[in-house]
Design a protein with these regions (language model features):
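N-terminal secretory signal peptides
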Residues: 1-37
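Structured, non-membrane catalytic/scaffold regions adjacent to prosthetic-group chemistry
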Residues: 8-9, 25, 60-267
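N-terminal secretory signal peptides and thylakoid transit peptides that target proteins
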Residues: 27-55
Length: 267
């Protein structure tokens, strides 16, 4: 693994003729950036020597900084992908440890959460799948479901334990004849949110197409009619109010990812 990482670093960054003190570089870069997401990325996302790698860029040049950050973010995505696997499971907890009330979190106020008509709702499938029929909630509710008590970890620094129930997403993808060799699965939501994940995460045994919370139909504030629950990912990677699922080889980014958040977003 060490050799792979060294090779990737050499491919991403050209040799620098100057040296810089890593801590001072980090301080100056943080001062250059106004976006909270970028500061957070520097403080929490620059792993595996990422800050040291920045010393080859001109930190007085915002464009240079942005370019370096993009390269490091992509590098982090690849490293997280290398470390990820179906046998690496997130911890599970006893129901007595559930956080009550479970916090609401979104890029809007709770009262502004979308009101989706469950009777009219149809989940749409797009992209590389054989079966593109639309799915009603009654049909989805009839599918075999499992539940999990896992920790939701927010990029903002807080966490909470909750109980989600739903259809293992890998089972659903196989049922619709999704191309499991495709690179990505992307999601479009009723609240205008969007994100995407890699296929390995989609097929992970703990990734759920969540339809319930704490034994009840998924409440509006938690993502009715469905959300993708991934305890292996940070909270912003777990889309709510899902309307469209697309299997694709085209990278589609995400709402927060397009503003600087790490795309892989592993927790």
């Amino acid at each position: 693994m060490k050799n792979i990482i060294k090779k990737s670093i050499s491919q991403i960054f050209s040799p620098s003729d100057s040296e810089a003190i890593v801590q001072e570089a980090q301080k100056q870069i943080i001062r250059q950036l106004d976006a909270p997401s970028r500061r957070l990325f520097l403080q929490r996302g620059l792993t595996l020597g990422g800050v040291a790698m920045l010393t080859g860029c001109d930190i007085s040049d915002n464009a240079s900084v942005e370019n370096a950050l993009g390269k490091i973010s992509g590098f982090n995505d690849r490293v997280q992908g290398w470390l990820f696997g179906s046998t690496r499971l997130a911890p599970v907890y006893a129901e007595s440890m559930i956080t009550r009330p479970f916090p609401f979190n979104a890029f809007y106020a709770e009262d502004d959460a979308p009101e989706v008509d469950g009777n009219a709702y149809r989940l749409k499938i797009a992209g590389l799948a054989l079966d593109k029929r639309e799915w009603s909630l009654p049909t989805l509710y009839k599918m075999a479901q499992v539940s999990q008590v896992t920790r939701h970890i927010c990029v903002e620094g807080w966490s909470a334990i909750g109980k989600w129930g739903g259809v293992p997403f890998g089972d659903f993808l196989r049922l619709i004849g999704a191309d499991l060799t495709a690179e990505y699965v992307s999601f479009k939501c009723a609240d205008q949110y969007y994100t995407s994940i890699d296929m390995a995460t989609a097929l992970h045994p703990q990734t759920l197409l969540a339809l319930t919370y704490d034994g009840q139909i998924l409440p509006r504030k938690y993502g009715f009619p469905m959300k993708l629950r991934m305890p292996t990912k940070l909270g912003y990677k777990n889309p709510k109010h899902i309307e469209v699922i697309e299997i694709t080889n085209t990278f589609t980014g995400g709402y927060w990812e397009d503003q600087g958040y790490n795309w892989f977003g592993g927790s």
